[in-house]
């Protein structure tokens, strides 16, 4: 086995272990934020939505800067610093008794993610061969699902005693992850050339097709982020107990572990990436619309199952499509920019979703936020369809001219 192949194989195992630690640390804390501050402390959902949206926007919106810096200086220093910063954010969250302190803790957490997320994504693109990326992203998603349910179970158990224990556990896991990277991650370069920060960012922003695709995905993310805000609140309201939230993540884990990899393997042989992304988004959108009209936990979990199946179809295709569009000369910058849609869609989804949830509750129209999210998903589906049809038309024109 050549040294390059050996490095790729070792890199795969490193990425999987690193990803599990990050997922556990994140899901111990974040699914319980809305339960803690909305249900237990009586805050308005929009206040918590602002905090979650701020974290999302900072982490993903500034990702292009984090990626460009990583292109220049390498992955290791950015990843270690970012993980320690997230640990500090979680520690601060444990003592948050005013909205501004929760917002500050989410700001710290988001800045940490800005530093470590783009270089971690770029390492996947660097180490995994193009023909294997779809399956590897599926493995990461399966791991995300298993880690989410384990983290949510652990966090729910700790929440019975003290929310500070929840946050301390998340902080410790990120400190361990920082130590793991500091000890074992080689000083790998992310790009084929050591690209200056400004040049990497400029290269991405001039790629109009990539930027348009990324911004359109904001609508997809408005739906996707509700697993952290409105869906846990809805499950808690219908079930009457915060402990029911863990079953939502258990459903996701079961579906992902049984369906994600087989669906990815089968669909990559029969369907284009664009079609898989659009089909998943359509299922997610249609499953969102009736959520506000259900009154039983069984009906709610059925709709959540459909939502997760849509995500299982769409997410590996989205990741693979984003990676395939990245320029090898500025991988970190491209993977950072690919999170821009998540920054915008996540922020709007959290803040707007929280506001619509409060508005629907006060107006006795609980279906309002869910119908709006479904409509946004349908419009995003149509916009992506138009973009992909334009791209195919341009390709056919070039082939005819040749």
From Swiss-Prot:
The chain crosses the membrane at residues 13-33, 99-116, 139-159, 165-185, 214-234, 244-264, 277-297, 300-320, 340-360, 368-388. Residues 34-98, 160-164, 235-243, 298-299, 361-367 are periplasmic. The lineage of its organism: Bacteria, Pseudomonadati, Pseudomonadota, Gammaproteobacteria, Enterobacterales. GO terms for cellular component: plasma membrane. It is found in: Cell inner membrane. GO terms for biological process: response to antibiotic. Its main location: membrane. HAMAP family: MFS_MdtH. Disulfide bonds: none annotated. Keywords: Antibiotic resistance, Cell inner membrane, Cell membrane, Membrane, Transmembrane, Transmembrane helix, Transport. Confers resistance to norfloxacin and enoxacin. Coiled coil: none annotated. This is Multidrug resistance protein MdtH. It comes from Escherichia coli (strain 55989 / EAEC). The keyword Cell inner membrane applies. GO terms for molecular function: transmembrane transporter activity. Residues 1-12, 117-138, 186-213, 265-276, 321-339, 389-402 are cytoplasmic. Belongs to the major facilitator superfamily. DHA1 family. MdtH (TC 2.A.1.2.21) subfamily. InterPro entries: MFS, MFS_dom, MFS_trans_sf, MFS_Transporters, Multidrug-R_MdtH. It is a multi-pass membrane protein. PANTHER family: MULTIDRUG RESISTANCE PROTEIN MDTH (PTHR23517:SF2), RESISTANCE PROTEIN MDTM, PUTATIVE-RELATED-RELATED (PTHR23517). The gene is mdtH. Pfam families: MFS_1.
């Amino acid at each position: 086995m050549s040294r390059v192949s050996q490095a790729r194989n070792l890199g795969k195992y490193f990425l999987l272990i690193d990803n599990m630690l990050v997922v556990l640390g994140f899901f111990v804390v974040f699914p319980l934020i809305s339960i803690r501050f909305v249900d237990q402390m009586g805050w308005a959902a929009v206040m918590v939505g602002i905090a979650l949206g701020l974290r999302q926007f900072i982490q993903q919106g500034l990702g292009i800067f984090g990626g460009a810096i990583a292109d220049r200086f390498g992955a290791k220093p950015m990843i270690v610093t970012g993980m320690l910063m997230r640990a500090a954010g979680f520690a601060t969250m444990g003592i948050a008794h005013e909205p501004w302190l929760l917002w500050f803790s989410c700001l710290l957490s988001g800045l940490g993610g800005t530093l470590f997320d783009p270089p971690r994504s770029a390492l996947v693109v660097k180490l995994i061969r193009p023909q294997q990326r779809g399956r590897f992203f599926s493995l990461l998603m399966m791991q995300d699902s298993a880690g989410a349910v384990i983290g949510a179970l652990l966090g729910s158990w700790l929440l019975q005693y003290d929310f500070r224990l929840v946050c301390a556990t998340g902080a410790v896991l990120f400190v361990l992850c920082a130590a793991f990277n500091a000890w074992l991650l080689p000083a790998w370069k992310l790009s084929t050339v050591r690209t200056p920060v400004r040049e990497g960012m400029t290269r991405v922003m001039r790629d109009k097709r990539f930027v348009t695709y990324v911004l359109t995905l904001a609508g997809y993310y408005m739906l996707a982020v509700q697993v952290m805000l409105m869906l846990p609140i809805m499950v808690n309201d219908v079930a009457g107990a915060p402990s029911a939230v863990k079953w939502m993540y258990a459903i996701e884990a079961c579906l992902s572990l049984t369906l994600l990899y087989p669906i990815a393997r089968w669909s990559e042989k029969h369907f284009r990436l664009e079609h898989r992304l659009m089909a998943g988004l359509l299922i997610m959108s249609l499953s969102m619309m009736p959520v506000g009209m259900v009154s039983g936990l069984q009906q709610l979990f059925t709709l959540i199952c459909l939502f997760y199946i849509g995500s299982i179809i769409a997410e590996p295709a989205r990741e693979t499509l984003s990676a395939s569009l990245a320029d090898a000369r500025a991988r970190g910058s491209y993977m950072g920019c690919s999170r821009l849609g998540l920054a915008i869609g996540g922020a709007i989804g959290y803040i707007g979703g929280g506001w619509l949830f409060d508005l629907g509750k006060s107006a006795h129209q609980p279906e309002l936020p869910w119908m709006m999210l479904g409509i946004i998903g349908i419009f995003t589906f149509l916009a992506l369809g138009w973009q992909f049809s334009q791209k195919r038309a341009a390709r056919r024109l070039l082939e005819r001219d040749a």
